[in-house]
Amino acid sequence: MKPEIHPIYREVVFHDVTSNFKFLTRSTMSTKETTLWEDGREYPLVKVEISSASHPFYTGKHKLVDTSGRIDKFKKRYAR
């Protein structure tokens, strides 16, 4: 492997902000935020909106996320 061309592969904490679930794994993601993990060490923090803890496929719960009223517009347009 060529030196100095590969990203740094390190332990990173991912935080699912939807379900408030955190997990520690290894990644090349870079971030300026850090968090204190359960082992007392500080790790880089990457915030994600959806992970296996909040995705409907994995949780078995179906919920609609309507960010701009698109569902209401659709229902109004095609209402009988």
From Swiss-Prot:
A biological process term (GO) from this entry: translation
Key words of the record: Ribonucleoprotein, Ribosomal protein
A Pfam family hit: Ribosomal_L31
GO molecular function: structural constituent of ribosome
Record flagged with keyword Membrane: no
Gene3D superfamilies per record: Ribosomal protein L31 (4.10.830.30)
Record flagged with keyword Ribosomal protein: yes
Gene Ontology CC: ribonucleoprotein complex; ribosome
Classification via InterPro entries: Ribosomal_bL28/bL31-like_sf, Ribosomal_bL31, Ribosomal_bL31_B, Ribosomal_bL31_sf
HAMAP family noted in UniProt: Ribosomal_bL31_2
Family of the protein in this entry: Belongs to the bacterial ribosomal protein bL31 family. Type B subfamily.
Subunit: Part of the 50S ribosomal subunit.
Protein name: Large ribosomal subunit protein bL31B
Organism: Xylella fastidiosa (strain M12)
